[in-house]
Amino acid sequence: ANDNAANALLKTLEEAPAHAILLLTADTPEQLLPTIISRCEILRLRPLPIESVEADLIYRGVDEERARLLAHISGGRPGYARRLVDDVTLLEKRDERLNDLQTLLPAARVEKFSYADKLSKDKDAMRQAITIWLSYWRDVMLRVAGAETPLINVDRNMEIEFLAGRLT
C-alpha cells in the first residue's frame, strides 16, 4: 500500500467531523495499516438475496435469463453482479476456469501438477481459479447432501448433478 495515501486516510479518520459516518470497504483489509484498522468498526456485510440482485439487474436493463445467471454467480453481491454485466471477460475467465476443472478431473497427475505450476506463476489467476472452483465444489457438495440451497453455478447444473451422483 502507498504510505502517503494510508497516512492521508488516517488523518481523515482522525479529523472527521463528529456527525460524519465514513464507510470504508476493503477486499484485503489485512493490507491496511494497523492504525487505520484500530480506528474502524468492522462490519461484515451479508450477501443480498439472489432475487434482489436479479431484480436490480433487470431494472438496469439486463434480460431476465442473464440477470438470473449473473445474480447466482455473484452470490448475492450486487457490486460483483454489476461488474459481471460491465466486463464480459469476467464471465469468460470463469467459464475458462470451470472448463479447466472439468478437463483436470480425469487428467493424469502429471497434467494436474503442470497446470498447478503454470497457475502458481500468476497469483491473481490462482486466486481467481481457487475462488471459482470453491464455488463449484460448494454446489457439488450441496447436491451430494441433498440440500435445496440455490446453486451459484446454475449454468453448470447438469455437470454438478452428474458429479454429485458419482460421489454418493
Question: For the regions a protein language model found, what residue spans apply to each?
Answer:
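Charged, glycine-rich active-site and insertion segments that engage polyanionic ligands
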Residues: 18-21, 27-132, 136-137, 143-168
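Conserved AAA+/SF3 P-loop NTPase catalytic/coupling segment centered on the Walker-B
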Residues: 1-10, 29-33
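Conserved catalytic/switch belt of AAA+ P-loop NTPases
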Residues: 7-21
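Short gly/ser/thr-rich secondary-structure transition/capping motifs
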Residues: 4, 23-24
